[in-house]
């Protein structure tokens, strides 16, 4: 099953997607310039494509994603100011959108 929702964070609009799998859930939040994803996704692919992507793990829903510490980030996300280990998902999205 797939769910979608619109989110607004500090005046910025994002689309959130949740896709159930047989053994878990795939979670993604997408802005106009940013992507926040769960552990199902690959930093290597984001780097190859040049996407601003931050990765959070151990999350079960969109609120968890926004509050979790970023575990890893693509090179373009790092250049936008995302700091794995100290930035939250919410902060990462805003940094990637605002730069």
Predicted regions, residues:
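Residues that scaffold, gate, or flank divalent-cation-dependent active/transport sites
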Residues: 1-99
């Amino acid at each position: 099953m797939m769910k979608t929702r619109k989110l607004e964070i500090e005046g910025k609009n994002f689309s959130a997607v949740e896709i159930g799998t047989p053994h878990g859930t795939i979670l993604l939040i997408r802005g106009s310039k940013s992507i926040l994803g769960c552990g199902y996704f690959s930093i290597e692919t984001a780097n190859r494509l040049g996407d601003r992507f931050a990765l959070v793990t151990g999350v079960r829903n969109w609120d968890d994603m926004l509050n979790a510490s970023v575990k890893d980030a693509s090179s373009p996300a790092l250049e936008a100011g995302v700091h794995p280990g100290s930035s939250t998902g919410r902060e990462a999205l805003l940094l990637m959108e605002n730069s």
